Amino acid sequence: MMIPLESKLIQSDLAKTTVLVPKLKKPGLASPTEAKTISFVVGFSGSARSQAALDLALCIAHQTRLAKPNPVLVHVVYVVDKTRPKTIANADRILWQARCLASEWRGSLDAHLRVGTVAKELSQVAREMDAEAILLGCYKPNHPLVKQLDQAPCPVLGLPR
């Protein structure tokens, strides 16, 4: 999985192609003696693109751990539509798949199973965890999900083209 990701990360216009919704984060209110956990949220569906987004998040988290003393945590969010029972039945398998990918990185991962609309639930988890970014398996800023995340509390990152 990392070989295609590595080749994409050597682009000169990487920031332009991955930042889908730019936002400036407001500084948190963590106490100076307390090491604030750095969090990243990944929208995960089990698709190849969402796996690549999780891989990218785990890579960013790994690099962040090397550069900062703070704990770093990746939050994988799988959202089920209660009107589609098949998505509920697949939830455990899909979140297990995410945990397996994280174990390859030896990264810290929290899995979240939510019921509702994807954009609303991703924004909610990002807000609750005071996330640095939401990562998606999208390539374009005009993707319907990206458009719905325009009010997200943090930047939304996609995959490099």
Feature map (PLM): residue ranges:
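Charged docking surfaces used in two-component/phosphorelay signaling
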Residues: L113-E121
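Conserved hydrophobic residues forming the short capping helix/wall of the S-adenosyl-L-methionine
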Residues: A61, A98-A102
